[in-house]
């Protein structure tokens, strides 16, 4: 029997997580463990908690919320505390409410859950559902169907990537999708703002905000294809070295020494 560990960054009560658990329980004869944050941890990236203790709070059969933990905390502690004899065959992070594309991947708690898994040597996928602000209720039907297909492929054929690599998967908002595309991550155009105010005691405070976010116009990027109605799969590697720039930096350093 296969073993699956699930986490997310929207919190243990999120709709995307509930839909995913229901589908996996119905479609796969697998031992499923869920460890999710006790509250929403969107955009927490790959942060882990080192300054205070964490605790599992059981909310169901093999279902735990991690008291004030991040997605990376959830995966790390689950692998080290809940799995004594055998590690999971697959870690799934999601389904996130909102896309995780382009450089947003670096901010994403959803993607960080998958990153932590592959750092620990476990194959992982990150799942995110794109939606429009006008949508009152998200439709996860396509996301669940595609996720089922991908997981079945992993179990039947093995994980398609090398160590320390994961699949970042995004699902379009459209009810009828055009297909699945393997593509690169796009390039975000950021425009961050910070709104200041003063509390009743005269102390200034700030709210961080991301206003008018956009992407560079790239034909075959994840965000471009997602907007056209395709589900996107982007292989992500944790090797951050810019190999093509090494010679340039070496030459630059040598020039500075002369």
UniProtKB/Swiss-Prot annotation:
It is found in: Cytoplasm. Gene3D superfamilies: Survival protein SurE-like phosphatase/nucleotidase. It catalyses: a ribonucleoside 5'-phosphate + H2O = a ribonucleoside + phosphate. A divalent metal cation binds at residues 9-10, 42, 96. InterPro entries: SurE (IPR030048), SurE-like_Pase/nucleotidase (IPR002828), SurE-like_sf (IPR036523). Keywords: Cytoplasm, Hydrolase, Metal-binding, Nucleotide-binding. Its EC number is 3.1.3.5. Binds 1 divalent metal cation per subunit. It comes from the Bacteria. GO terms for molecular function: 3'-nucleotidase activity; 5'-nucleotidase activity; exopolyphosphatase activity; metal ion binding; nucleotide binding. Its cofactor is a divalent metal cation. It is an enzyme of class 3 (hydrolase). GO terms for cellular component: cytoplasm. Nucleotidase that shows phosphatase activity on nucleoside 5'-monophosphates. Belongs to the SurE nucleotidase family. PANTHER family: 5'-NUCLEOTIDASE SURE, 5'_3'-NUCLEOTIDASE SURE. This is 5'-nucleotidase SurE. It comes from Campylobacter jejuni subsp. jejuni serotype O:23/36 (strain 81-176). The gene is surE.
């Amino acid at each position: 029997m296969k073993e699956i560990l699930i986490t997310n960054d929207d919190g243990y009560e999120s709709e995307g997580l509930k839909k995913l658990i229901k589908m996996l329980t119905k479609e796969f004869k697998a031992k499923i463990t869920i460890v999710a944050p006790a509250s929403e941890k969107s955009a927490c990236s790959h942060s882990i908690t080192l300054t205070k203790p964490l605790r599992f709070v059981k909310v169901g059969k093999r279902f735990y919320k991690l008291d004030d933990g991040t997605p990376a905390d959830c995966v790390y502690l689950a692998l080290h505390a809940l799995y004594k004899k055998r590690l999971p065959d697959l870690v799934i992070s999601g389904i996130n409410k909102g896309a995780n594309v382009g450089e947003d991947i670096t901010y994403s708690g959803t993607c960080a859950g998958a990153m932590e898994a592959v750092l620990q040597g476990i194959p992982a996928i990150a799942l995110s559902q794109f939606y429009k602000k006008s949508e009152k209720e998200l439709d996860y039907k396509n996301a669940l169907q595609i996720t089922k297909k991908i997981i079945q492929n992993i179990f039947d054929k093995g994980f398609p990537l090398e160590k320390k690599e994961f699949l970042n998967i995004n699902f379009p908002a459209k009810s009828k999708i055009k297909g699945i595309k393997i593509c690169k991550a796009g390039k975000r155009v950021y425009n961050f703002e910070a709104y200041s105010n003063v509390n009743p005691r005269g102390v200034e405070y700030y709210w961080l905000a991301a206003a008018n976010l956009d992407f560079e116009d790239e034909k075959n990027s994840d965000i471009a294809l997602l907007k056209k109605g395709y589900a996107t799969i982007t292989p992500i590697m944790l090797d951050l070295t810019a190999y093509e720039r090494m010679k340039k930096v070496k030459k630059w350093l040598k020039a500075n020494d002369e």
